[in-house]
Curated annotation (Swiss-Prot):
GO terms for cellular component: cytosol. It catalyses: oxaloacetate + phosphate = phosphoenolpyruvate + hydrogencarbonate. Keywords: Carbon dioxide fixation, Lyase, Magnesium. One of its GO terms (molecular function) is magnesium ion binding. The active site is at residues 144, 553. It comes from the Bacteria. This is Phosphoenolpyruvate carboxylase. The gene is ppc. It is an enzyme of class 4 (lyase). InterPro entries: PEP_COase, PEP_COase_bac/pln-type, PEP_COase_Lys_AS, PEPCASE_His_AS, Pyrv/PenolPyrv_kinase-like_dom. Belongs to the PEPCase type 1 family. It holds the Pfam family PEPcase.
Length: 888
């Protein structure tokens, strides 16, 4: 680790910790402060001295009363949040100084490095420019329930980061620094005195507003900033400026549109979110226009502008006042529709082009009269925002599970006395759907809604399609079908949109997410392309979503990764053969078992040819805050996506050799068998999950609007992928990320030729390199001792669970050994000392939270409903999530 580069980080952590200590003394008293300090010192000792110190740490915690446990948990949790603020600020500091955060260099690289690599590989400038012009990166913000921090605290944490930035200023004297330190202390005090636990689950509308706030507070500034930065880097390389409407990055959202397994997302909710987005967009553009009104006071104008405004001394302001009036009307109309009030008359902005036209006229006029420098200022920023955000802020995807659509068609066919759609085979379904999609007559009449066949569930799906028809295409993105398995699943949604009278249908995107569905994806899409009407519909492009969460829960990390890779390979080849552009939509989460990985690693480990200048990817939960919560961090991460997409397109990774593929399949077969042997066949696993991990208690934490389970049964199959990962992460066993993989690596190492082959794959094949690197990262966060603490406290008198715990910990140990044999490194993350330091520096603060959590779970199970214990438990869950920097 570079101690000089990271000295300011250590100073910041020390400052924040000292200020937190002051607040703790002031608010909780000397006794609590001294208790926390004793626990911290004992925790540090457990990492250096081992068992005896662990006993003393337990002796400190066990006798504490419930109220003291709560304060202790809050102290350690708050320190971990402050450490994250300091680390995030340090990244911003280094980015401003054009330095990489140590350890980042091998994973994420900016446009300058990529342009240099392209030049070194003799890629023509014309090819680079052409690819950049067509580049399309769409980030889809989702509200998956992994953000444990309340918005009110996030705002305070942002204030702390701003004050740390001010303390970096070299022009401040000591009085000015002391003033900032005092402000920082007050903000930390305010955070300490704020309830860190969300007491009520957010509604889908609350989640959507949270997404809007990320745009308002960060991305609204970051998007024009990153485009200026990219443009400057292209100029430095002698590359032409991109066209004025260049928008390589766009935003979409699932917040308020994702109804898969979430009964709280209804048609009225989706309608409200779409209207709120337009309301927020109008408000943000109004702020821009007010600034432009103040700036564009000049008289000199083109004949074109004067023809539009008439004779005037301030032609720019005349036109901008008209724009302002129409934006105000747009805002009032959206507000009235949301509130259910009479809608004011007048012409609101309904399409991007309507707002773009007057702003482009101003731009042309300024350039025509020699004021290009003025045009390149705030006006250019606004035009760039309009190209990225449109007038709807972002495009809302709709997601629904495939059987909900077939249930509607089953109700319709029974109403029409055609039989039961659900009983038809796939060929019969396809024949019916093709006929109805090409028919000119309506399929059902108004009376269907009043029939016994139109249940509440059927009516809800149809109502959603009617909202799509009413709101129009401007603010809508993809209609994603989860658990898609057959061609009829795709055509069913096309027919439902037709029934609802959708004039500009949403593109229909199948989501392939289980192992079987990924393996069958090519066959499904090939069958669709064999239908002439379907080929015609998707001639301009097809989008397909690859699911990471459910495939990993189904088959384990390694099995899912290989299935995803092969599916993408086959789909890329299929659409290339048919001459149809393909966009792959990656449903990634924060943890590696849900597809999480650094941007460049993720894109360069895709099959060659699968990126092709186009990528769509989900950004979920706490990842949104870490990557896009502050403008400077957002600029950095947006640049990563543009640079990595360009690199993956023009310098695609090496294709897998046949012998690598054969070896990978052997590894996968062993891995899937090992994973399923535990997850499906181990009779005690469900009981272990519910007893030793906080899986049951997680449902009490008001994380998101979506239920933790798809169905009411208590088995693993009904548990969603996010709480499945979250629960194992809390006890540091990280089971979904490694189970089965270790057995596969061990198996290969028993044969010298196979072991050599796997080592070759790890050094030469980007896909497998990514698998190994991500496995190493997650294993470094695992901790056998911590998992054993939970078992001992919560299952110590249960031989069956203790036996299973011992088996799982032995397998984890074997996985670490197998990985070390593969990489040749004695210790995990020897090649990334900064990440190792980042994990280890947090351990003395996460360890007490783990012990506290196990103790609190035990007490709560004896005193169910105790409010103090429940609050303390929720604090430990949030604190551990902060310490590990990911949850689900």
């Amino acid at each position: 680790m570079d101690h000089n580069v990271n000295a300011p980080l250590r100073d910041d952590v020390r400052l924040l910790g000292d200020l937190l200590g002051e607040c703790l003394r002031q608010q909780a008293g000397d006794s609590i402060y001294e208790t926390v300090e004793k626990i911290r010192q004992a925790s540090v000792a457990t990492r250096t001295e081992g068992g005896a110190s662990l006993a003393s740490l337990r002796d400190l915690l066990s006798p504490l009363d419930d109220a003291t446990l709560l304060e202790v948990a809050r102290a350690f949790s708050q320190f971990l949040n402050l450490s994250n603020i300091a680390e995030q600020h340090h990244r911003e500091r280094l980015h401003r100084q054009h330095q990489r955060y140590p350890g980042d260099a091998g994973t994420d690289q900016g446009l300058q490095e990529v342009l240099q690599r392209l030049a070194d590989n003799d890629i023509a400038k014309e090819q680079i420019s052409g690819t950049l012009e067509q580049l399309s990166v769409e980030l889809v913000l989702t509200a998956h329930p992994t953000e444990v921090t309340r918005r009110t605290l996030i705002r305070k944490y942002d204030q702390m980061a701003d004050l740390l930035s001010e303390l970096d200023r070299p022009d401040f004297n000591e009085d000015e620094r002391e003033l900032r330190r005092e402000r920082l202390r007050r903000v930390i005090l305010a955070a300490w005195c704020t309830d860190e636990i969300r007491r009520e689950k957010p509604t889908p509308v609350d989640e959507a507003k949270w997404g809007f706030a990320t745009i308002e507070q960060s991305l609204w500034q970051a998007v024009p900033d990153v485009l200026r930065q990219l443009e400057a880097q292209l100029a430095d390389r002698g590359l032409p400026a991109p066209p004025s409407d260049w928008a390589p990055v766009k935003l979409a959202s699932w917040m308020g549109g994702d109804r898969d397994g979430n009964p709280n997302v209804t048609a009225p909710v989706t309608r409200e979110v779409l209207l709120l987005a337009r309301w927020m967009a109008a408000d943000l553009y109004l702020r821009d226009v007010e600034n432009l009104l103040a700036d564009l006071s000049m008289k000199s104008a083109s004949e074109e502008l004067l023809a539009a405004t008439g004779p005037t001394h301030e032609p720019y302001r005349v036109l901008l006042r008209e724009v302002r009036s129409r934006l105000r009307l747009t805002r009032r109309q959206m507000e009235a529709q949301v509130e259910g009030l009479p809608v004011p008359e007048g012409q609101a902005y309904l399409r991007r082009e309507e707002l773009m036209a007057p702003l482009q006229l101003l731009d042309r006029s300024l350039r025509a009269v020699g004021l290009s420098d003025i045009a390149d200022g705030d006006l250019k920023n606004t035009l760039r925002r309009l190209n990225c955000f449109g007038i709807t802020l972002l495009r809302l995807d709709i997601r629904q599970e495939s059987t909900r659509h077939s249930d509607v068609l089953d109700a319709i066919t029974r109403y029409l006395q055609l039989g039961r759609y659900s009983d038809w085979d796939e060929a019969a379904r396809q024949a019916f759907l093709v006929d109805e999609l090409q028919a000119r007559r309506p399929l059902i009449d108004a009376a269907f809604r009043d029939s016994e066949h139109c249940t509440a569930e059927v009516a809800e799906v149809l109502a959603t399609c009617e909202v799509i028809a009413e709101q129009g295409s401007e603010g809508l993105g993809a209609y994603v079908i989860s658990m898609a398995t057959t061609p009829s699943d795709v055509m069913a949604v096309m027919l439902l949109q037709k029934i609802a009278g959708v004039r500009e249908p949403m593109r229909v995107v199948p989501l392939f997410e289980t192992l079987d569905d990924l393996d069958g994806a090519e066959q499904t899409m090939s069958a669709l392309l064999a239908l002439p009407f379907y080929r015609e519909r998707v001639a301009a492009g097809q989008e397909i979503m690859i699911g990471y969460s459910d495939s990993a829960k189904d088959a384990g990390f390694l099995g899912a990764a290989w299935a995803q890779y092969r599916a993408q390979e086959k789909l890329t080849a299929l659409f290339a053969d048919n001459g149809i552009p393909l966009t792959l939509f990656h449903g990634r989460g924060g943890s590696i078992s849900r597809g999480g990985s650094p941007t460049r690693m993720a894109l360069l480990s895709q099959p060659p040819g699968s990126v092709a200048g186009r990528i769509r990817v989900t950004e979920q939960g706490e990842v949104i805050r870490f990557k896009y919560g502050r403008p400077s961090v957002a600029v950095f991460n947006l640049e990563q996506y543009v640079a990595a997409t360009l690199e993956a397109t023009l310098l695609p990774p090496q294709a897998a050799r046949p012998e690598w593929r054969q070896q990978m399949q052997a590894l996968t077969d062993t891995s899937v068998a090992g994973y399923r042997g535990v997850v499906r066949d181990e009779p005690e696993l469900v009981r272990y999950l519910r007893t030793v991990t906080p899986e049951t208690e997680l449902s009490r934490l008001a994380l998101g609007s979506r239920p933790a389970r798809r169905k009411s049964d208590q088995g693993i199959s009904s548990l969603r992928a996010i709480p499945w990962v979250f629960a194992w992460t809390q006890i540091r066993l990280m089971l979904p990320a490694w189970l089965g993989t270790g057995a596969a690596l061990e198996d290969a190492q028993n044969d010298a030729a196979q072991h050599a082959m796997v080592r070759e794959m790890a050094s030469e094949w980007p896909f497998f390199q990514g698998v190994v690197d991500m496995l190493e990262m997650v294993l470094a966060k695992s901790d056998l001792r911590v998992a054993a603490w939970y078992e001992e406290r919560l299952a110590g008198d249960d031989p069956g669970l203790m036996r299973l715990g011992e088996v799982l910990r032995e397998r984890l140990t074997a996985t670490v050994s197998a990985l070390s044999a593969l990489t040749g490194r004695e210790d995990l993350l020897d090649n990334n000392p900064v990440m190792r330091w980042s994990i280890r520096v947090r351990d003395p603060y996460t360890d007490p939270l783990h012990l506290l959590q196990a103790e609190l779970m035990a007490r709560l199970r004896q005193q169910d409903g105790d409010e103090t214990l429940e609050s303390a438990l929720m604090v430990t869950i949030a604190g551990i999530a902060a310490g590990l920097r990911n949850t689900g």
